[in-house]
Amino acid sequence: MNQMEIFKNPEFGSIRVIEENGKYLFCGTDVAAALGYSNPRDAIIRHCRYVVKRDAPHPQSPDRKISMTFIPEGDLYRLIVHSKLPSAERFERWVFCLLYTSDAAD
């Protein structure tokens, strides 16, 4: 597995991300929770098309692995589009800045 990164934002919290074959995969539960879905797992099932499972280090025990649900960028935008929160647009701008510019402070 590639190294996990954590993208942090004061408004949206932390999003765990891995890079695989030059593309980012986002922790689906982190994204759905940041976008205000009351049931993040259900939101992933209903809106995401290309869900993948990857092993990641266990947060309390780095020697152990846990299986996590990751989504590609296209599914990230699907969750944004279906979110009913007004902050979804700000979330989209923040992620876009992280992925496509060097200034992610916006």
Where do the protein language model's features map onto the residues?
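A short, sequence-level motif marking secondary-structure junctions
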Residues: E20-N21, G74, T101
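Non-catalytic, well-ordered alpha-helical segments in soluble enzyme domains
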Residues: A32-Y37
